[in-house]
Amino acid sequence: MSSKASKAPASKAPAEKKPAAKKTSSSVDASKKRTKTRKETYSSYIYKVLKQTHPDTGISQKSMSILNSFVNDIFERIASEASKLAAYNKKSTISAREIQTAVRLILPGELAKHAVSEGTRAVTKYSSSTQA
């Protein structure tokens, strides 16, 4: 007979529960306050554009939240499409060309034309400012 057959399974005793440490308000140090996590939004940029186009018009917090969600959604769609285009062409970098093509694919007709022209203008302006 083997030695394994004669051995009985070890019985496990339940682990002893230790009393939980009580947390008191005096143990919290006043100098160690928890910092609020920053949430990045497009609110300040949306507000600046609003004031450029309609200086005397305001915007509610709910409307700002909706516009912020809209900008995040469009950004995500364009980035996703540009990523697919880069993968199709076996490139690891998303360039201005992929972004431009993604905009043409996602936005309809005239809106795509205006977006491409504004994007081209912004890239040209940025390029000229970095060279100077």
UniProtKB/Swiss-Prot annotation:
The modification N6-acetyllysine is found at residues 7, 12, 17. GO terms for cellular component: nucleosome; nucleus. Residues 1-40 are annotated as: Disordered. The modification Phosphoserine is found at residue 11. There is a cross-link at residue 125 (Glycyl lysine isopeptide (Lys-Gly) (interchain with G-Cter in ubiquitin)). Residues 1-13 have a biased composition (Low complexity). Keywords: Acetylation, Chromosome, DNA-binding, Isopeptide bond, Nucleosome core, Nucleus, Phosphoprotein, Ubl conjugation. It comes from the Eukaryota. PANTHER family: HISTONE H2B (PTHR23428). The nucleosome is a histone octamer containing two molecules each of H2A, H2B, H3 and H4 assembled in one H3-H4 heterotetramer and two H2A-H2B heterodimers. The octamer wraps approximately 147 bp of DNA. This is Histone H2B.1.
